[in-house]
Amino acid sequence: RVYRGTDTQAPDPLIEAKQGAGNAPAYRGTAYVVFERIPLDRFGNRLPQFQFEVMRPVGKVAQSVRAVALIPGSTEFGLSPDPVSDEPIAGQKRWINRNILRARSDWTASLDELQALCPDLHHVAIVLPWFGDDLRAGSCRIRPGVTALSARKPSQVWKVENVTRADAHLISRSGDGAAYGGTPSDQSVIAAIRDLKARGLKVTLYPFIMMDVPPDNQLPSPYGGIGQPAYPWRGRITCHPAAGVAGSPDKTAVAGEQVQAFVDGPWGYRRFLNHCADLAQQAGGVDAFLLGSELRGLTGIRDGQDSFPFVTHLCALAAEMRAILGSGCQITYGADWSEYFGYQAQDGSGDLFFNLDPLWSHPAIDAIGIDNYMPLADWRDSDLDEGNPDGFETAYDLDGLTRQVVSGEGYDWYYASVEDRETRRRSPIADGLAGKPWVYRYKDLESWWSNRHYNRLAGAEATQPTAWVPHSK
């Protein structure tokens, strides 16, 4: 019997029987193991050697963690609480998702450890990837992927939606192996959600686009030339050519048509999100659901009416997800930290739009979602000798980092170019039009959240605000 050293554990019944009721300690705060009637004849009539791995949270960080995201997510059976095997060679059994001996699967061992090390854990996000194959919005297909198109005698068959292994997207090779793991099977996702809920944890389902564009591709790039960047960030999916590139359809009806193809094509974004929501519903529901994340290259595309068609589609998708998932599920979109607060045209016009406000104010959206990687330091190695302009004593100056949450880069100043960053030539953030510098300060969440938002077009601020209501989400 294993006692994990909790503050509520009771005395072991064998020890209590030997020492008498009320005389046996519970050893609360101490982890220990009791063996009863162990058959020593199997070990030469002497105690065998035992080996234990003891884990406990050290310091404040692990004990303060309340939520985690399970990444990278690209694992065909890694989310399965049950062991899965195949037979790569006749007669040779291989465990696919069990690389340990202390639990039935890697998932079970990992979650057991996570809960032991993070006692205040309440919420887990499951990252669920499908694979995009093109940065051109109108040509990008989003499909479930596998690392091999066949498997020999699998104990659990891989299937996603109605796609079998033989029909799935084959993930490209990088070096000696696949560039990514595969999409988790539907069966494993449902089992993972149910297992997390059985552990008393809340669950977020996080649909995620991974871009499988190999280095040797010859795809036209939205940003110019032939050959798209290898394994790019999903935030670079955009119209073709991209805004600012010669011949771009941005601000025309054609841009809207390309976005429409991305969302509603045979392998479009709507199909992806609907399937993820269906999985959540089949698993008995989830506590939160994301409409994806960091698709800033799409949310910034304008049509011929200065509207943002992908944002309109996100609003429709939010309503569709609400219909599937019900009122008890929180829904949002994980906007990039450089995306959530608005869109500033880079064409010299000075146009400024709070382009995501229709989404943030939509009744199906419960919260403002931000993938937050805002810079908190501008530390250089030379600062050890020459001093840091922001008063940092070291790269790990906690007081300095705390100050930079509402100051520094993205609040007081910005770097106008790569050269400016290299030389630390800082430009102040100011608003000469309406005296509202917060519209350009991505770090100034409080002002963005507390004020009405007015779009700007052709050098003038609109007289009517957007649909955003301060403090509403």
Tell what function each PLM region has.
Residues V68-P88, H122-D306, I324, C329-S338:
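Substrate-binding cleft and catalytic face of glycoside hydrolase catalytic domains
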Residues R1-L79, K93-R94:
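Polar, S/T/G-rich
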